[in-house]
């Protein structure tokens, strides 16, 4: 007795289903775009921080509602630290004009960590959409990105200036546990080591607490 085998036709995926799956994959990759100096908290907020030059410590730049805002904060901080030599910026087209505002034509400005935080916060709030050329005027805090950043940088001259190149400043001033930085004997919670992620998870450090 010979058994006859019946061939079952293979199901061909429709072009519409394949195109929809590819589009969903591409949209998912867009949503998950990664920015330098930015990471996402488990509850959805985005935090930004930047490593201090030649150190294990990081400067805390704040917590933001969008990844783009946190990325702009990182760009501003990187320009404060490295000036015109800064590369690998998240938004080079925005950061070019930001560099001139921060330095005001001077490439040798040393800024304290607190001043860097202020400039980063102003850059993050300057525009809610990097691709948008207009800024909403409904909020008094967003009147003009240039004016906001100029005011922030001008205020920094009243801060205690901590040079990034002097040994008496925030270089080589770790405490015994290598967990926090101290500036002239004063604890500086906005400077953290790369091993202190638990410090951040205790709760957001509100940027304006240091103003």
Curated annotation (Swiss-Prot):
Disulfide bonds: none annotated. GO terms for cellular component: nucleus. Residues 1-32 are annotated as: Disordered. Keywords: Activator, DNA-binding, Ethylene signaling pathway, Nucleus, Transcription, Transcription regulation. Residues 34-92 bind DNA. Residues 13-29 have a biased composition (Low complexity). GO terms for biological process: ethylene-activated signaling pathway; jasmonic acid and ethylene-dependent systemic resistance; positive regulation of DNA-templated transcription; regulation of innate immune response; regulation of pectin biosynthetic process; salicylic acid mediated signaling pathway. Gene3D superfamilies: AP2/ERF domain. Its main location: nucleus. Pfam families: AP2. The keyword Transcription applies. CDD domains: AP2. GO terms for molecular function: DNA-binding transcription factor activity; transcription cis-regulatory region binding. It is found in: Nucleus. Probably acts as a transcriptional activator. Binds to the GCC-box pathogenesis-related promoter element. May be involved in the regulation of gene expression by stress factors and by components of stress signal transduction pathways. Belongs to the AP2/ERF transcription factor family. ERF subfamily. This is Ethylene-responsive transcription factor ERF014.
């Amino acid at each position: 007795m010979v058994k006859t085998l019946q061939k079952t036709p293979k199901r061909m995926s429709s072009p519409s289903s394949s195109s929809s799956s590819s589009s969903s994959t591409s949209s998912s990759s867009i949503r998950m775009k990664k920015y330098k100096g930015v990471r996402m908290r488990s509850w959805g907020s985005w935090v930004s921080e930047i490593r201090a030059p030649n150190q294990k410590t990081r400067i805390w730049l704040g917590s933001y509602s969008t990844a783009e805002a946190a990325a702009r904060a990182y760009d501003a901080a990187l320009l404060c630290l490295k000036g015109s030599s800064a590369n690998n910026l998240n938004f080079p087209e925005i950061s070019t004009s930001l560099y001139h505002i921060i330095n005001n034509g001077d490439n040798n400005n040393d800024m304290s960590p607190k001043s860097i935080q202020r400039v980063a916060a102003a850059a993050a709030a300057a525009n809610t959409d990097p691709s948008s050329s207009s800024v909403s005027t409904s909020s008094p805090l967003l009147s003009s990105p240039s004016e906001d950043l100029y005011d922030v940088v001008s205020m920094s001259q009243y801060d205690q200036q901590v040079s990034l190149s002097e040994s008496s400043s925030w270089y080589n001033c770790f405490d015994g546990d290598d967990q926090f930085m101290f500036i002239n004997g004063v604890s500086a919670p906005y400077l953290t080591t790369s091993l202190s992620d638990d410090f951040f998870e205790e709760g957001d450090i509100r940027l304006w607490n240091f103003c």
